[in-house]
């Protein structure tokens, strides 16, 4: 019996991977992607796969707690995905690139990146004017993923209007109501992060 919704979401994640890799935002086997299905299961990339060369067998299923449903090993950062889905019931996709601008910017600032008065902010869900200000928190990297996931989830619970967060020296996470929405956020945010690095005098 075919799991049609899973197959559809897997195809969308594969396409997103090709797009993101084509821009150099997931080098080597970095990054991880997921999509939440209607029944609460989560389609997520298998650990260690190159995101620009994903195949259907490179997408697996986990439950809402991040436990494998097919015996394979999910992304090392699965708990960061499940935390986002708990905090945002409307979210049905999470994308995590290791993009150059977000990684570099996290070396230039501490605590948070402030994005303000950019027209492209309107690419983010719920924003309809450039005259706005969003805070993108920057968290120190941590190889203890459960500890990092708890710290991030606690922040997200306390703060409204968060569209993304950066892990220092690592990359960023963003989410949306669909894979297409999350991908739009990735593209817009990486552009804005690049502009912010230039404002710090860094030429790319």
Curated annotation (Swiss-Prot):
Binding of Zn(2+), residues: 96, 98
Protein keywords: Amino-acid biosynthesis, Lyase, Metal-binding, Methionine biosynthesis, Zinc
Pathway: Amino-acid biosynthesis; L-methionine biosynthesis via salvage pathway; L-methionine from S-methyl-5-thio-alpha-D-ribose 1-phosphate: step 2/6
MF terms (GO), sorted A to Z: aldehyde-lyase activity; methylthioribulose 1-phosphate dehydratase activity; zinc ion binding
Any one biological process term the GO annotation gives: L-methionine salvage from methylthioadenosine
Keyword tRNA processing in annotation: no
Listed InterPro entries: Aldolase_class_II_sugar_metab, Aldolase_II/adducin_N, Aldolase_II/adducin_N_sf, MethylthioRu-1-P_deHdtase_MtnB
EC nos: 4.2.1.109
Note on cofactor: Binds 1 zinc ion per subunit.
Presence of the UniProt keyword Metal-binding in the record: yes
Catalytic reactions on record: 5-(methylsulfanyl)-D-ribulose 1-phosphate = 5-methylsulfanyl-2,3-dioxopentyl phosphate + H2O
SMART domains per the UniProt record, alphabetical: Aldolase_II (SM01007)
Named cofactor requirement(s): Zn(2+)
HAMAP family in the cross-refs: Salvage_MtnB
Function: Catalyzes the dehydration of methylthioribulose-1-phosphate (MTRu-1-P) into 2,3-diketo-5-methylthiopentyl-1-phosphate (DK-MTP-1-P).
PANTHER family per UniProt: 3-OXO-TETRONATE 4-PHOSPHATE DECARBOXYLASE-RELATED, FUCULOSE PHOSPHATE ALDOLASE
Family: Belongs to the aldolase class II family. MtnB subfamily.
Record protein name field: Methylthioribulose-1-phosphate dehydratase
Gene field: mtnB
């Amino acid at each position: 019996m075919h799991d049609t919704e899973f197959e559809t979401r897997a195809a969308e994640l594969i396409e997103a991977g090709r797009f993101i890799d084509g821009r150099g935002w997931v080098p080597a086997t970095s990054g991880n992607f997921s999509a939440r299905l209607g029944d609460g299961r989560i389609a997520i990339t298998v650990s260690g796969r190159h995101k620009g060369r994903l195949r259907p067998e490179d997408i697996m299923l986990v439950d809402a707690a991040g436990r494998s449903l097919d015996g394979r090993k999910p992304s090392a950062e699965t708990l960061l995905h499940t935390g986002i889905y708990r905090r945002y019931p409307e979210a049905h996709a999470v994308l995590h690139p290791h993009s150059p601008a977000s990684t570099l910017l996290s070396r230039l600032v501490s605590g948070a990146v402030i994005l303000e008065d950019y027209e492209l902010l309107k690419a983010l869900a719920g924003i309809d004017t450039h005259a706005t200000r969003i805070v993108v928190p920057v968290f120190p990297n941590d190889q203890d993923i459960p500890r990092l996931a708890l710290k991030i989830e606690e922040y997200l619970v306390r703060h409204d209007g968060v569209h993304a967060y950066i892990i220092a020296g690592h990359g960023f996470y963003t989410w949306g109501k669909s894979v297409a929405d999350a991908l739009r956020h990735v593209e817009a945010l990486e552009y804005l992060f690049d502009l912010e690095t230039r404002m710090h005098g860094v030429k790319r």
